[in-house]
């Protein structure tokens, strides 16, 4: 029997490959960073070839380091940064421009115009998304309009569009597909019919010929070229990073929720087969589709997206230079007893849910002569938790439920100070699992189910284990005062860059 699943985890700042055994444990992991490109204020790009080369390199390297071959791998599962938009030549397989990253805000004015034209309700009803430059649709339109010759070539059927999952699968196998979870992040996909939407494509002037075929999240969608790993490996699982993390956290039942603390911060609440429309500026999105085709059972999610979480810590390191390593932030923050009145609004690229203000900008308020770098570090960590509170309050209003616990993962979930503060501000227990690499684990589980490496979701759920539980311990008065101060500071940051 083949012993491992290879998870490909393509993130915003690095590409990783992780091997999982049948117990859902990590057998080997390799990571490689690659550069982000910032050609103008508010613009963020990637070289799609740099993504491909780094991802292939770590996949090959992890097999080599563990003295394994393709014969030991039952399947590949792919998870990816979502919304990031790639446009490439079908014949050569080469990108015709840099990829536009999910953080990129260049199409904010286009979204403003579409809202002014009264199109926001149509987009929300069909896609479950707010009309924001965060999503792929307006990014793709921008590429077609601003890349010389792109629109003519697209009309001739020479070009292919995809999010990062599509791009990697094309490079691995030659197939042009995407799963329902990634498609649901494009502003072009009807989450109810589970098909590309002709009306929305026409509104954004996007040719249907560009689009990948829609496939389930769990199922064999292609075989890797034999030249890549010595023999072919089935590609059997696909999900956007946050949906994959939700699956990896075994949040398989309605009412279960997880929060991932990565570059951004993303809370997803499973609503089962019901797509709940948000009235509080959250997103309704597809979690996963399990079955032989896209008409199979689909689980929906409510999602709150926070743009800046781990990226704040990177800025403290690279922008301010007040820490040498990201892991140093907890020690610096705990060197002072509190934030000293400092509040940090990390709206470097606007504010996400529930504000959706692309014109908000990063703000630090409440500083005095007594403020120092430790207060700023502590306020930066606290801002991650505060943004999560804003999302949860909106989520509970939409779903009409009170959360019983929050499962957490991602790099910053290893920060005990942040997790305790998160429990205090949410006023619910925060639970950290033994395996915090749940994004890659979710992709592995989806692939493993497709090839019978695991038999069922129930078997997967038994593998989930708690590492630590953080109980809330803040007084009601302090809780209320802190939230009041946070919301005052948010108002200072909003609508700044108009």
Curated annotation (Swiss-Prot):
Control of this protein's activity: Inhibited by fructose 1,6-bisphosphate (FBP).
Coiled coil: none
PANTHER family, alphabetized: GLYCEROL KINASE (PTHR10196:SF69), SUGAR KINASE (PTHR10196)
Catalysed reactions listed for this entry: glycerol + ATP = sn-glycerol 3-phosphate + ADP + H(+)
Keywords tagged on the record: ATP-binding, Glycerol metabolism, Kinase, Nucleotide-binding, Transferase
GO CC annotation, single: cytosol
Enzyme Commission number(s) of this protein: 2.7.1.30
Gene Ontology MF: a single term: glycerol kinase activity
Stored SUPFAM superfamilies: Actin-like ATPase domain
Protein name: Glycerol kinase
Keyword hit for ATP-binding: yes
Binding-site list for glycerol: 82-83, 134, 241-242
UniProt: ADP binding residues: 12, 16, 263, 310, 411, 415
């Amino acid at each position: 029997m083949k012993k491992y699943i290879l998870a490909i985890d393509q993130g915003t700042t690095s590409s990783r490959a992780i091997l999982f055994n049948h117990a859902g444990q990590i057998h080997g992991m390799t990571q490689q960073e690659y550069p982000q490109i910032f050609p103008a204020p508010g613009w963020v790009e990637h070289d799609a070839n740099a993504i491909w080369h780094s991802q292939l390199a770590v996949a090959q390297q992890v097999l080599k380091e563990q003295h394994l071959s393709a014969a030991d791998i039952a399947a590949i599962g792919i998870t990816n940064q979502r919304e990031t938009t790639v446009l490439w030549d079908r014949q050569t397989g080469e990108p015709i421009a840099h990829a536009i990253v999910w953080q990129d805000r260049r199409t904010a004015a286009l979204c403003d115009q579409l809202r002014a034209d009264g199109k926001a309700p149509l987009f929300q009803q069909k896609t479950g998304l707010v009309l924001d430059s965060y999503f792929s649709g307006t990014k793709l339109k921008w590429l077609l309009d601003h890349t010389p010759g792109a629109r003519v070539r697209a009309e001739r059927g020479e070009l292919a569009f995809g999010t990062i999952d599509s791009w990697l699968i094309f490079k691995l196998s030659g197939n042009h597909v995407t799963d329902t979870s990634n498609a649901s992040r494009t502003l072009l996909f009807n989450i109810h019919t589970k098909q590309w939407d002709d009306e929305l494509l026409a509104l954004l002037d996007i040719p249907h010929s560009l689009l990948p075929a829609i496939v389930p999240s769990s199922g064999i969608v292609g075989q890797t070229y034999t030249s890549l790993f010595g023999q072919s490996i089935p590609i059997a699982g696909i999900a956007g990073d946050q949906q994959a993390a939700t699956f990896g956290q075994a949040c398989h039942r309605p009412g279960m929720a997880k929060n991932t603390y990565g570059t951004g911060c993303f809370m997803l609440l499973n609503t089962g087969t019901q797509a709940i429309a948000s009235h509080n500026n959250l997103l309704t999105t597809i979690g996963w589709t399990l079955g032989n085709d896209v008409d199979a059972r689909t689980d929906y999610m409510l999602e709150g997206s926070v743009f800046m979480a781990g990226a704040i810590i990177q800025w403290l390191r690279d922008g301010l230079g007040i820490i040498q390593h990201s892991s140093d932030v907890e020690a610096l923050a705990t060197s002072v007893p509190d934030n000293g009145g400092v509040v940090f609004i990390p709206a470097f690229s606007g504010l996400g849910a529930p504000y959706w203000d692309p014109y908000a900008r990063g703000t630090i308020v409440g500083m005095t002569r007594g403020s120092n770098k430790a207060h700023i570090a502590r306020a930066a960590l606290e801002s991650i938790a505060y943004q999560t509170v804003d999302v949860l309050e909106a989520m509970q209003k939409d779903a009409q439920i009170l959360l019983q616990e929050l499962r957490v993962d991602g790099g910053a979930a290893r920060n005990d100070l942040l997790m305790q503060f998160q429990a205090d501000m949410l006023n619910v227990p925060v639970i950290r699992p033994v395996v915090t690499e749940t994004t890659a684990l979710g992709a592995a589980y989806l692939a493993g189910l497709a090839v019978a490496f695991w038999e069922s979701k129930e078997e997967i759920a038994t593998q989930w284990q708690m590492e630590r539980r953080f109980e809330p311990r803040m007084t009601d008065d302090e809780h209320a005062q802190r939230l009041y101060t946070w919301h005052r500071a948010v108002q200072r940051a909003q609508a700044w860059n108009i």
